[in-house]
Amino acid sequence: MESMLDRPEQELVLVVDDTPDNLLLMRELLEEQYRVRTAGSGPAGLRAAVEEPRPDLILLDVNMPGMDGYEVCRRLKADPLTRDIPLMFLTARADRDDEQQGLALGAVDYLGKPVSPPIVLARVRTHLQLKANADFLRDKSEYLELEVRRRTRQLQQLQDAVIEALATLGDLRDNPRSRHLPRIERYVRLLAEHLAAQRAFADELTPEAVDLLSKSALLHDIGKVAVPDRVLLNPGQLDAADTALLQGHTRAGRDALASAERRLGQPSGFLRFARQIAYSHHERWDGRGFPEGLAGERIPLAARIVALADRYDELTSRHAYRPPLAHAEAVLLIQAGAGSEFDPRLVEAFVAVADAFAEVARRYADSAEALDVEMQRLEQAVAESIELTAPPA
């Protein structure tokens, strides 16, 4: 769309009239102050109206053979390129009904013939000024809209970067080379988008909610920053005290995110999802999970979705203490958990998108380097545990 800054200083007026003398008269009257373009028929006027640069104002004779001024006006107002150009009718008709018809079609003024030069110049100047004001407001509005979009994109990019940084803090405790987080984000999106197409979930899983849920899933283990390495990385059986420490990561994550939500001072869909997920993604459908032993739909939907995605990732990822399961085996195990570990409806959705899960697992598989790092960290954790449990000399 043409900006006011791109326009020449002198406005362009298009005059459409089938009488050459009238065209000459209007040109002589206007050309000292404006650029003037003329057309001798309705069709010629339509062509002239879309030529670049487009006119700022159109003076249009009503009584023309073939295509009269009213029809020209209708077509101009129907064309997105010309509908906002102000149009003034010129006519020898003095009938009030004719004037009402012209104004109803979108004309801004109605001038009688023979024209009065001072009145024509005054009306032309008035309508050009009105158009300039309208264009200024439109351009300013467009600029502000573009600026808001730009700022929104910047804030979104900043938010995404902060989310990734925070999520990585938690993931670093397990394995800094793992691609667990990119996989989880994509698994959650696949499940949520499939569920969103079902009536039972459509209200809760709007497109915006799916985006927020996918991103907030990255923070599911943020509370692990509060768990000692010797507990977090211990491949063996934990005692009761260490089990409590490990399970405490759900409360630590929830409390940190709840604190952020309070400091924000207003509701945040992202933080709400993140808090629910961090606290409840280890709950089970049958109520045998932790930290609260919630069952069924008392477990937030976001947490139920992440629980299934996280379980699939655990089963199909390479670990230092065990090889990954094949995709088909993982699918069977998750199906077996329907009604006990997982919401049965989510398991149905998972089966429907299982091939896409397999593709994500393949594309974002951990490298051999990630496995080496995990092995080193496990060895360090075991050594630390031995030191802590060794009897004093």
Swiss-Prot record:
Residues 12-128 form the Response regulatory domain. A divalent metal cation 2 binds at D221, H249, H281, H282. SMART domains: HDc (SM00471), REC (SM00448). Phosphodiesterase activity is activated by phosphorylation of the N-terminal regulatory domain. Phosphorylation triggers a conformational change of the HD-GYP domain, which renders the active site accessible. SUPFAM superfamilies: CheY-like, HD-domain/PDEase-like. The modification 4-aspartylphosphate is found at D61. Disruption phenotype: Disruption mutant has increased levels of cyclic di-GMP. Mutation leads to reduction in both swarming and twitching motility, to an increase in pyoverdine production, and a reduction in virulence. It produces a biofilm with little heterogeneity. Phosphorylated. It catalyses: 3',3'-c-di-GMP + 2 H2O = 2 GMP + 2 H(+). Residues 155-366 form the HD-GYP domain. It comes from the Bacteria. One of its GO terms (biological process) is phosphorelay signal transduction system. Keywords: c-di-GMP, Hydrolase, Metal-binding, Phosphoprotein. Its EC number is 3.1.4.-. PANTHER family: CYCLIC DI-GMP PHOSPHODIESTERASE TM_0186-RELATED, CYCLIC DI-GMP PHOSPHODIESTERASE VC_1348-RELATED. Phosphodiesterase (PDE) that catalyzes the hydrolysis of cyclic diguanylate (c-di-GMP) to GMP. Hydrolyzes c-di-GMP to GMP in a two-step reaction, via the linear intermediate 5'-phosphoguanylyl(3'->5')guanosine (pGpG). In vitro, can use pGpG as an alternative substrate and hydrolyze it into GMP. Acts in regulation of motility, synthesis of virulence determinants and biofilm architecture. May act preferentially as a pGpG binding protein. Homodimer. This is Cyclic di-GMP phosphodiesterase PA4781. It comes from Pseudomonas aeruginosa (strain ATCC 15692 / DSM 22644 / CIP 104116 / JCM 14847 / LMG 12228 / 1C / PRS 101 / PAO1). The lineage of its organism: Bacteria, Pseudomonadati, Pseudomonadota, Gammaproteobacteria, Pseudomonadales.
